[in-house]
Amino acid sequence: MTILLCFFLVSLLTIVSSIFLKQNKTSKFNLPPSPSSLPIIGNLHHLAGLPHRCFHKLSIKYGPLVFLRLGSVPVVVISSSEAAEAVLKTNDLECCSRPKTVGSGKLSYGFKDITFAPYGEYWREVRKLAVIELFSSKKVQSFRYIREEEVDFVVKKVSESALKQSPVDLSKTFFSLTASIICRVALGQNFNESGFVIDQDRIEELVTESAEALGTFTFSDFFPGGLGRFVDWLFQRHKKINKVFKELDAFYQHVIDDHLKPEGRKNQDIVTLILDMIDKQEDSDSFKLNMDNLKAIVMDVFLAGIDTSAVTMIWAMTELIRNPRVMKKAQESIRTTLGLKKERITEEDLGKVEYLNHILKETFRLHPALPFVVPRETMSHIKIQGYDIPPKTQIQLNVWTIGRDPKRWNDPEEFNPERFANSSVDFRGQHFDLLPFGSGRRICPGMPMAIASVELALMNLLYYFDWSMPDGTKGEDIDMEEAGNISIVKKIPLQLVPVQRY
């Protein structure tokens, strides 16, 4: 029976594949260069490893635009700033939708969030809500005290390790910091108060598992339709995604139930803001929110806010310990600017140290937390650098490769913040050499919140402490192996020894 089933699947996939290959060969489009493909799977065999590095190798051989067919899904990989500008600026509207995958659909409650919602009226309304109500400058400032309190707590814990001369697991420290900030900002939940439904370690594990679920491709993603769903069912490909979703949903529901109790909305967190909007809705309103919309928006803030900021800080401190000259200059710049023996560093001090801003930019260039801009999908036929990009083509922008382009950057593999000293290049979406938050209509709305958290934490740790490798090892020997799928983090946790300076 099993042999017959396998024979049936292979035969069916071969027929389907031959149809797609025939269509591709007879295509009237001038498609970008493409590596050789195989029956059924297309170019999937080229993805043996971390995707950003696999696509990087293809771009070296085939150029800044590469056409792939992943199963039956057409994909164009963008690997230059010029091509990125053509997508994100020139053709922003035509490339403004999102491809639908099983993982993103499940965790976003059917694409009811901001990040994965397809382009249309719903996305415009929910995006407006995010920009005006949730992440406006005024709202980000209102959460300033939370960021300052949580960074103060980190400084206190690191000071305790400094007294013992014991190493600090900075990977865990940064994930704990961002989780604490986001849980208070988004959910009104404080790890340090009793009654928290999930302990902090489980929160961090859940974020990692959720990122894996979002980055786990199923047969349905590559072979849309009944056949893909059948193979997924046969091999239980949705099991892990459903398990993570079930735990996240229970967590969100617990938080919402707490907010619905009397005195449950004493904090002006994001859940409170959206529940208040739901309460004020009228029957005649054309745009209405429900609990699934709320959970989907919280999912965006919760997962993206915790993961990406922590990953950025880990890579920044990793590069600083590997480059003592840069570390020393950063500490001297911060200490000279802020003065000696400063009791507390707050967000009033942000923006005062230009060299720290250069370090952030250089970290975003070499180690973007997300090596790809969240994938886009073309809604109509467009042309990029003379090549045809048909409708319903997935666009993958490899910002990791763009940040290492030797045509745009001198010594691209070197961590050198000084390259930004006389440069106007910034990370806010107007310069296509540096795109950690994307650009155009779908730029990340949480960018101001993320930058404030990262800069405040790094400024504190570099001001109050000197840092060294444990057990007499040297920074140049540190392991730089990457891990992950959607976000790329240092595989081996970063452990450093702090020495109290002030």
Curated annotation (Swiss-Prot):
Heme binds at C444. PROSITE patterns: CYTOCHROME_P450 (PS00086). Pfam families: p450 (PF00067). It is an enzyme of class 1 (oxidoreductase). InterPro entries: Cyt_P450, Cyt_P450_CS, Cyt_P450_E_grp-I, Cyt_P450_sf. The chain crosses the membrane at residues 1-21. It comes from the Eukaryota. The keyword ATP-binding does not apply. Keywords: Heme, Iron, Membrane, Metal-binding, Monooxygenase, Oxidoreductase, Transmembrane, Transmembrane helix. Its EC number is 1.14.-.-. GO terms for molecular function: heme binding; iron ion binding; monooxygenase activity; oxidoreductase activity, acting on paired donors, with incorporation or reduction of molecular oxygen. Its main location: membrane. It is found in: Membrane. One of its GO terms (biological process) is heat acclimation. Expressed in root, leaf and influorescence stem of 3-4 week plants. It is a single-pass membrane protein. One of its GO terms (cellular component) is membrane. Its cofactor is heme. Belongs to the cytochrome P450 family. This is Cytochrome P450 71B2. The gene is CYP71B2.
